[in-house]
């Protein structure tokens, strides 16, 4: 179940995800605001690529710049999703994103665990990680469909060990001290 009751988006007229056809598995997820996704090519990626390809020794600032250029952009959705403990929300790319817009999800899929919703340090807003490999910046308008969400039940192994720790934060917090 998705909701748009995030405090920072109150009164902004966000649309809850919905399926487009009777047999659709995925709920279309929209951008919560206008955002421009820069092209990796316009962010000095070509220079760094040539240095690597030609066997040049890179210095630390080159590595830092490459990491910054290839860092995904987080597109806010303004929604959060409540699920039972044995469900997960999978975020998948829309086929039109890669085919028509040169937009990819660099993590392949997004995994939204049930305990991401309203944990102590994170209200649970869902973001979609994207990377624009097209040659131009891509403008995404509020309300444009940017991903699809699929709710899936999952199983645990017979020898799964009980876990006492709870999630305390958001992105990248699983398994870190003070995170989960």
Region roles according to the model:
Residues 4-180:
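DUTPase catalytic domain/fold
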């Amino acid at each position: 179940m998705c909701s748009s009751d995030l405090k920072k988006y109150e009164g902004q007229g966000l649309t809850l995800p919905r399926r487009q056809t009777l047999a659709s598995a995925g709920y279309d997820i929209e951008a919560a605001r206008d955002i421009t996704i820069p092209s990796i090519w316009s962010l000095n990626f070509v220079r760094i690529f040539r240095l690597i390809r030609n066997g040049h020794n890179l210095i630390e600032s080159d590595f830092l710049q490459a990491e910054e250029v290839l860092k995904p952009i987080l597109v806010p959705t303004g929604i959060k999703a409540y699920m039972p403990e044995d469900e997960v929300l999978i975020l998948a790319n829309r086929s039109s994103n890669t085919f028509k817009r040169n937009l990819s999800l660099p993590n392949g899929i997004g995994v939204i665990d049930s305990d991401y919703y309203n944990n102590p340090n994170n209200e649970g807003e869902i973001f979609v990680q994207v990377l624009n490999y097209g040659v131009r910046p891509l403008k995404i308008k509020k309300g444009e469909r940017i991903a699809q969400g699929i709710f899936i039940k999952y199983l645990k192994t017979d020898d799964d060990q009980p876990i006492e720790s709870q999630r305390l934060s958001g992105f990248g917090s699983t398994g870190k001290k003070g995170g989960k």
